[in-house]
């Protein structure tokens, strides 16, 4: 998974852009953890817990996007997609799955979070 971080010098907002098929991961980083050190620490602690309990699924439910870790697999999914599956609603306006869910390895995800932490501290 490739990614790039940017900071808007005019308004101070931080941005995380991830490669195609991982766009939702970038959105999750921006919208759910942002530059808040406590949230970043919470995610890093969840990664440590996942390594200690590889058979347990660990979740961090966000306002719009949620994170799930099971073993060495990380899934980031738009909450609206979860609700659309629950409701089994068929609609031409349903979210495009590829932009609403992404999976990556735990090591890649941990590296992304660590690099994000360093970037927002600058």
From Swiss-Prot:
Family annotation (Pfam families): UPF0231
Annotated InterPro entries: UPF0231 (IPR008249)
Domain of life: Bacteria
Family affiliation: Belongs to the UPF0231 family.
Name this polypeptide is given: UPF0231 protein VV2750
């Amino acid at each position: 998974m490739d990614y790039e971080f940017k900071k808007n010098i005019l308004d101070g907002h931080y941005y995380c852009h991830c490669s195609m098929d991982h766009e939702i991961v970038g959105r999750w980083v921006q919208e759910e953890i942002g530059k808040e050190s406590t949230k970043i620490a919470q995610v890093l602690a969840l990664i440590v817990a996942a390594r200690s309990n590889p058979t347990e699924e660990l979740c961090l439910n966000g306002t719009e996007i949620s994170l799930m870790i099971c073993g060495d697999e990380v899934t980031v999914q738009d909450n609206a997609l979860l609700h659309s599956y629950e409701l089994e609603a068929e609609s031409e306006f349903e979210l495009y799955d590829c932009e609403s869910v992404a999976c990556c390895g735990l090591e890649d995800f941990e590296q992304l979070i660590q690099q994000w932490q360093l970037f927002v501290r600058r």
